[in-house]
Amino acid sequence: MLIALLIILAYVIGSIPSGLIVGKLAKGIDIREHGSGNLGATNAFRTLGVKAGSVVIAADILKGTLAAALPYLLHVPIHPLLAGVAAVIGHVFPVFAKFKGGKAVATSGGVLLFYAPLLFVTMVAVFFVFLFLTKFVSLSSMLTGIYTIIYCLFVKDPYLLVVVTLLTAFVIYRHRANIKRIINKTEPKIKWF
């Protein structure tokens, strides 16, 4: 029973629509009606600006970190990655935002920040290298996911490998419209990096 309650709590934490809340507070807008219509950090940066976008990405990362920490904080015998995955599902399908959320990148990163901090640090570095080279946030996110799988092949943690592989597949699936735009050369590039 405690495990089920913890999973529900992790999902609810993930469901907190950071982009929607920050958009309303910072600019008085619903970011789902602007830019890509997505609740995630990339649309927040594009729609709300760097300061508000930074708050959204920090909040989305924190959701994953907090959810992964719940088993330790509440002394519930469940793997932290499972709790983290529940938060990622909440972020993508948030009960508080009609089940239309972000693309799982920042919240997945937050899970890894708690469970595998070295992986998280290298992921951030790899992401910015890809971003510098490609100027596409979406492509950089997907390539960083593939990097995490390769990293996990060298770490003796089968749970981490399975979860990272599933999360990367999910991130790529959530970016399928971006993939089409990249192929059609209509995906917007960032201009500030």
From Swiss-Prot:
It catalyses: an acyl phosphate + sn-glycerol 3-phosphate = a 1-acyl-sn-glycero-3-phosphate + phosphate. Its EC number is 2.3.1.275. GO terms for molecular function: acyl-phosphate glycerol-3-phosphate acyltransferase activity. Catalyzes the transfer of an acyl group from acyl-phosphate (acyl-PO(4)) to glycerol-3-phosphate (G3P) to form lysophosphatidic acid (LPA). This enzyme utilizes acyl-phosphate as fatty acyl donor, but not acyl-CoA or acyl-ACP. One of its GO terms (cellular component) is plasma membrane. The keyword Lipid metabolism applies. It comes from the Bacteria. It is found in: Cell membrane. Belongs to the PlsY family. It is a multi-pass membrane protein. The chain crosses the membrane at residues 2-22, 76-96, 112-132, 152-172. One of its GO terms (biological process) is phospholipid biosynthetic process. NCBIfam families: glycerol-3-phosphate 1-O-acyltransferase PlsY (TIGR00023). This is Glycerol-3-phosphate acyltransferase. Probably interacts with PlsX. It holds the Pfam family G3P_acyltransf. Keywords: Cell membrane, Lipid biosynthesis, Lipid metabolism, Membrane, Phospholipid biosynthesis, Phospholipid metabolism, Transferase, Transmembrane, Transmembrane helix. Pathway: Lipid metabolism; phospholipid metabolism. The gene is plsY. InterPro entries: G3P_acylTferase_PlsY.
